[in-house]
Amino acid sequence: MSGMSALELIRIVSRDSPMALAQVARVRAELAALHPRTRTEVVAVKTTGDKWMGDLSKVDGKGAFTKEVDAALLAGEADLAVHCVKDVPADRPLPAGTMFAAFLKRDDIRDALVHPGGLTLDELPPGTRIGTSSVRRVAQLAAAYPHLECVPFRGNANRRLEKLAAGEADALLLAVSGLERIGREDVITEVLEPETMMPPIGAGILALQCREGDTGLIETISELGDPGTHREATAERMFLHVLQGHCNSPIAGYARTERNGELSLRASVFTLDGKTVLNAHEWAGRLDPATLGTSVAVALLRQGARELIDDIPH
């Protein structure tokens, strides 16, 4: 490929949910700003995870949202895939022949409370039903707010808001970045700091995946990447990889680039009843991001994280 002019068309594969298509729109806009002559088109696929409304651990967990997307990439039906890092399984490598070419600048990592009556999490009365199927949220609520009740809630953010309006729960916990992507930040009652509700690994990060051999495309796409986000994603994914966490694990954590430019990683592993919480927090110092992730994972394993993770069916 001679120069970037060779890339006339980039086919982007995506789940066909409103959230996923909003993510693709961001990628197309950022590409257009850098390479106005490159056209993009969207190849939409329905994934197992989108079609299945039951328990995710029954259909390959997190992989339920990525398998069909990976297949389109490997079959050459598309050139680029957009993933939420939090939905990409870290307990196994990316499909052979594919790689992440870039991590976009990170969005808000925090969770939001949506309560039609406008109450904050601290103000919710005992017995309030919180709609969430995330073991990470269930465990943290059980630990800090045992008087609240969690009811299983699946479906995309729009669907969950509909179910809330229909009275299937009294309040919801949703990612701030997800609500922003679909233009529904108006429903947020309270934004929860990570100290209150620790986010999932990879929160608010979009990763761009392509085939390893597409050097011209990789070169183009890597220009969209954000170096700080790349370091954070690398530390977080290595952390999850060493812990061998699965989609049903109550693991939470986030890397943060401190004001002095140094990377830190804070993470926790919980029991579902919230009675046991293991914590670790380290600064990188001279360590590279992957080594930082390994170090924090090892600190949690020393505290008994393996038993907590393996106790949960997946």
From Swiss-Prot:
Substrates-to-products reaction catalysed: 4 porphobilinogen + H2O = hydroxymethylbilane + 4 NH4(+)
Organism: Streptomyces avermitilis (strain ATCC 31267 / DSM 46492 / JCM 5070 / NBRC 14893 / NCIMB 12804 / NRRL 8165 / MA-4680)
HAMAP family in UniProt: Porphobil_deam
More about this protein: The porphobilinogen subunits are added to the dipyrromethane group.
GO biological process: protoporphyrinogen IX biosynthetic process
InterPro entries attached to this UniProt entry: HemC (IPR000860), Porphobilin_deaminase_cofac_BS (IPR022419), Porphobilin_deaminase_N (IPR022417), Porphobilinogen_deaminase_C (IPR022418), Porphobilinogen_deaminase_C_sf (IPR036803)
Cofactor stoichiometry and binding remark: Binds 1 dipyrromethane group covalently.
Chain's role: Tetrapolymerization of the monopyrrole PBG into the hydroxymethylbilane pre-uroporphyrinogen in several discrete steps.
Any single GO CC term annotated in Swiss-Prot or TrEMBL for this entry: cytoplasm
Keywords noted in UniProt: Porphyrin biosynthesis, Transferase
Entry-linked NCBIfam families: hemC
Cofactor(s), by name: dipyrromethane
Pathway: Porphyrin-containing compound metabolism; protoporphyrin-IX biosynthesis; coproporphyrinogen-III from 5-aminolevulinate: step 2/4
The encoding gene: hemC2
EC numbers, comma separated: 2.5.1.61
Name of the molecule in the record: Porphobilinogen deaminase 2
UniProt keyword Phosphoprotein, yes or no: no
Keyword Transferase: yes
Binding partners and assembly: Monomer.
S-(dipyrrolylmethanemethyl)cysteine: modified positions: C247
Family of this protein: Belongs to the HMBS family.
Lineage of the organism: Bacteria, Bacillati, Actinomycetota, Actinomycetes, Kitasatosporales
Gene Ontology MF annotations: hydroxymethylbilane synthase activity
PANTHER family from the UniProt entry: PORPHOBILINOGEN DEAMINASE (PTHR11557:SF0)
